[in-house]
Amino acid sequence: MSNRVVCREASHAGSWYTASGPQLNAQLEGWLSQVQSTKRPARAIIAPHAGYTYCGSCAAHAYKQVDPSITRRIFILGPSHHVPLSRCALSSVDIYRTPLYDLRIDQKIYGELWKTGMFERMSLQTDEDEHSIEMHLPYTAKAMESHKDEFTIIPVLVGALSESKEQEFGKLFSKYLAEPSNLFVVSSDFCHWGQRFRYSYYDESQGEIYRSIEHLDKMGMSIIEQLDPVSFSNYLKKYHNTICGRHPIGVLLNAITELQKNGMNMSFSFFQQASWRRRMGAAAV
C-alpha cells in the first residue's frame, strides 16, 4: 500500500491572489485589522470567492468571527463552476497547499461522508481548476494560524442540487454543524449581472442599475437571515438572482433547519456588503 501524500497546489496563487507568502500574510492582516469580531465564535460563515482585489476586505468581516481556540474542523462548501454535478464531491488529495502553510484534509470525516454513498470524487484537475474552495484557504490559514497544527479541513464541492437533495445534504451535515468545534464556511458571491452572465434584471423604481442590484441582493440576504430554506428557494425562483453559491447556502439553511427542530437556536447576521458595485457580502451564524 502506498503512503504517498497527494497535494493540491495553490493553482490560483499569482493570479487571483498573490503567491508571495509574506505579502499575502500582510494583506490578510491588514484587512482583518480593520474589522471587529461581533458574532464570535461563529458556527458558520458566508464569504465571497472573487479575486482578493475585489473581495479581500469583505471576506475579513466573516473570518474575523472565527475563534481558532475552539475550532478544530472547518467544512468548506463551494459551488462547482466548471464541471456538472448533481451531487456533492470530495477531494482525492490529502493536503491543500497555500502560500502560508499546508492544510490537512480530515480523512476520518471524509471516510464517514464517503460511506453514505451520497458523494462523488473530484479529479485533481477538477479540484485545481475550481476557485470557489481555494479562495477560502488563505483566509482559513490566517484565521487559524495560532492553532495551525490543531485543525483539519473538509472541502466539499457542491453541485446543482435539487431542493430535495439540499434537504438530504443539510440533514447529513446538521450533525457536524451541531458540534461547537466545527465551523462551516460557505463560499458564495451574490448577483452576477450583465450579458456575460445572461442576467439583466432591473427594477426601474430603484433608480440606477447598481441600486437595483443592491436592492435585489439585500432582499436575498434578508431572506437568508430568516434561516428559512423554502423562502430562499422561492426568492430564487421569482428573481432568478445569479447567486453562484445558492446550493451551498441551501444546504447550510437546511442543516440549520434540522437543528432548529431539535431546539437549537441560531441567528444569522450580514456584516457588510462592501461596494455594491461589486455585489458581495459577508455573514456569520
UniProtKB/Swiss-Prot annotation:
GO terms for biological process: regulation of microtubule-based process. It comes from the Eukaryota. The modification Phosphotyrosine is found at residue 210. Keywords: Phosphoprotein. The keyword RNA-binding does not apply. The keyword Phosphoprotein applies. InterPro entries: MEMO1_fam. It holds the Pfam family Memo. Belongs to the MEMO1 family. Interacts with ERBB2. May control cell migration by relaying extracellular chemotactic signals to the microtubule cytoskeleton. Mediator of ERBB2 signaling. The MEMO1-RHOA-DIAPH1 signaling pathway plays an important role in ERBB2-dependent stabilization of microtubules at the cell cortex. It controls the localization of APC and CLASP2 to the cell membrane, via the regulation of GSK3B activity. In turn, membrane-bound APC allows the localization of the MACF1 to the cell membrane, which is required for microtubule capture and stabilization. HAMAP family: MEMO1. This is Protein MEMO1. It comes from Bos taurus. The gene is MEMO1.
